[in-house]
Regions:
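Amphipathic helical "hinge" segments at domain boundaries
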Residues: 1-26
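Hinge/beta->alpha junction and helix N-cap segments in small-molecule ligand-binding domains
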Residues: 3-12, 63-73, 89-111, 115-137, ...
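Glycine-rich phosphate-binding loop signature in dinucleotide/nucleotide-binding domains
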Residues: 22-24, 81-82, 139-145
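Short, Asp-centered acidic motifs that coordinate Mg2+ and/or phosphate
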Residues: 26-28, 50-51, 148
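Flexible loop/hinge segments that line or gate small-molecule binding clefts
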Residues: 31-73, 155, 187, 198-210
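Residues that mark the start of a beta-strand
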Residues: 49, 83-85
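Flexible loop/turn connectors
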Residues: 144-147, 156, 161-260
Length: 260
């Protein structure tokens, strides 16, 4: 088994796909972010069985999450506890799942509840804590009247929490810092609520939990491996598309799930 990490770099993903094809390997599992013309060309031409996880494609077996439905559920939940205004830090819409689908779903969820997400309250971030921090700080320094910062990933949300601390210029008590409760202290001492997507367990441990979306990442990995083995054993087949559900957590009393 060979593993390769590309730091969400599309060109490097295609490079490694070609490398694996020529190695050769029996099959490939691609955990994708942005699908480019290079990705599509590879999937159309390759004779190696491929399973794509995290993105929807008609060119290979794929397992993807209901990002639109998850975004809509989060938007409706946020509308329920926001009393001022809502801000959203998304990622590039070139990522059809975490970018376009979550963004569109979130806006639709707010709209269903009669809440508008104004353009001046939107930012686009990279998939990093540092970029989330910079985007959130830019929002806060623009003096927009908000009480919720909703983020496309939990990693971005972690950066947003740190940005709140910088903006408010509050000193973290030594006992909170020493106990690993820095982020929890920040959230408990601000009127701004931060939400995310991904249900990151490390973030949950240091914050006590924020409203977020739990996706079936473990299930997608298991199903992906099963699909790949089946493709290797049976040869070329019509591509299978499998959509997994989600669970909204930490947003009482509006917690809901859609695990179909």
């Amino acid at each position: 088994m060979l593993l390769a990490g590309t730091d969400n770099t599309p060109a490097k993903e295609v490079e490694y796909l070609r490398l694996f094809e020529n190695y050769p390997v029996d099959g490939i599992i691609l955990v994708g972010t942005m699908f480019t013309a290079g990705h599509r060309k590879f999937l159309k031409e390759t004779k190696v069985p491929v399973v794509v996880i995290g993105q929807r494609t008609s060119h290979a077996n794929c397992i993807y999450h209901d990002d639109y439905g998850a975004g809509k559920a989060m938007g409706q939940a946020v509308a329920g506890f926001s009393k001022k205004g809502v801000a959203y830090i998304g990622v590039t819409r070139d990522d059809k799942a975490a970018g376009a689908a979550r963004d569109d779903g979130f806006i639709a969820g707010l709209k269903n509840a009669g809440v508008t997400l104004f353009e001046e309250n939107k930012r686009t971030s990279a998939f990093t804590l540092e970029s989330g921090y910079e985007s959130a700080l830019d929002l806060l320094e623009s003096k927009c009247d908000i009480d919720v910062i909703s983020c496309a990933t939990d990693t971005i949300a972690a950066g947003a929490i740190e940005a709140i601390q910088t903006y408010l210029k509050k000193q973290i008590p030594t006992n909170a810092a020493d106990a690993g409760a820095r982020m929890r202290y920040i959230l408990e001492n601000t009127s701004i609520r931060v939400t995310g997507f991904g249900d990151n367990q490390m973030l949950k441990a240091v914050t006590g939990g924020i409203p977020t979306i739990h996706f079936g990442y473990k299930t997608s990995g298991i199903r992906g491996a099963e699909l790949l083995l089946d493709s290797i054993e049976k040869g070329e087949q019509i591509p299978i598309e499998m959509k997994l559900g989600f669970r909204l957590v930490g947003a009482d009393p509006s917690d809901s799930e859609n695990l179909t």
